[in-house]
């Protein structure tokens, strides 16, 4: 099951556009206290910087919704919590805030683990609830894939 993959590792989340949805999915699983350490909802740029150590220059040059910010969020969450893995999301849930380059539903996610940080860009729909649900599911799948990849020694 889903929980079995996660329970062998300690986990943390750093969420922006998903607003704690990933953390909520972890805590809904029985036995979560054994592996889920911390969930940070860093919605503002200031909180991304102050809580997770995201470089304000990166936000200024790349935008909060960018691969680099997702990477720094995940790495920051892993660093501050000591978790084996941290998963991060930053995106545009809508209905406002989209641009031609980054339309509503654009979500960058990242997983920082013991050996590497991986990132993924997904288009998660146009409805706010749908974006949150899909981004959470994609991020959890990315996390699961990374844990399994490491377990297989790849």
What spans do the regions from the language model cover?
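Glycine-rich phosphate-binding loop
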Residues: 1
């Amino acid at each position: 099951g889903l929980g079995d993959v996660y329970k062998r590792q300690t986990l943390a989340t750093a969420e922006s556009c998903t607003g704690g949805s990933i953390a909520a999915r972890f805590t809904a699983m029985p036995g979560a206290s054994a592996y889920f350490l911390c969930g940070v909802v860093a919605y503002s740029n200031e909180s991304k910087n102050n809580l997770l150590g995201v470089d304000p220059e990166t936000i200024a040059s790349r935008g909060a919704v960018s691969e680099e910010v997702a990477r720094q969020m995940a790495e920051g969450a892993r660093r501050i919590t000591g978790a084996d893995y941290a998963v991060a999301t930053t995106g545009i849930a809508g209905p406002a805030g989209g641009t031609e380059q980054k339309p509503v539903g654009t979500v960058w996610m990242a997983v920082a683990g013991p050996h590497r940080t991986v990132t993924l860009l997904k288009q998660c729909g146009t409805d706010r609830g749908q974006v949150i649900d899909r981004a959470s599911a994609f991020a959890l799948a990315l996390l699961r894939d990374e844990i399994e990849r490491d377990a297989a020694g790849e």
